[in-house]
From Swiss-Prot:
GO terms for molecular function: structural constituent of ribosome; zinc ion binding. GO terms for biological process: translation. GO terms for cellular component: ribonucleoprotein complex; ribosome. Its cofactor is Zn(2+). This is Small ribosomal subunit protein eS27. InterPro entries: Ribosomal_eS27, Ribosomal_eS27_Zn-bd_dom_sf, Ribosomal_zn-bd. Part of the 30S ribosomal subunit. Keywords: Metal-binding, Ribonucleoprotein, Ribosomal protein, Zinc, Zinc-finger. Belongs to the eukaryotic ribosomal protein eS27 family. Signal peptide: none annotated.
Length: 62
């Protein structure tokens, strides 16, 4: 029997809002629109699997 190691293929991202420079964590495969908690700008939109990130990615969290 072959055992397959599954890696987590989705990650959390720390992004910076281009308007107010607030940093927050978003899921790479977000299924809903993610807005900045400070100014309300859209940071990520769902796009058939992976989200379309509209902010600067600061770090990939493990």
């Amino acid at each position: 029997m072959v055992r397959v190691n599954r890696e987590n293929r989705s990650t959390f991202l720390r992004v910076k809002c281009p308007d107010c420079e607030n940093e927050q964590v978003v899921f790479e495969r977000a299924s809903t629109v993610v807005e900045c908690t400070v100014c309300g700008r859209i940071l990520a939109e769902p796009h058939g699997g992976k989200a379309d990130i509209k902010a600067e990615i600061m770090a990939v969290l493990e």
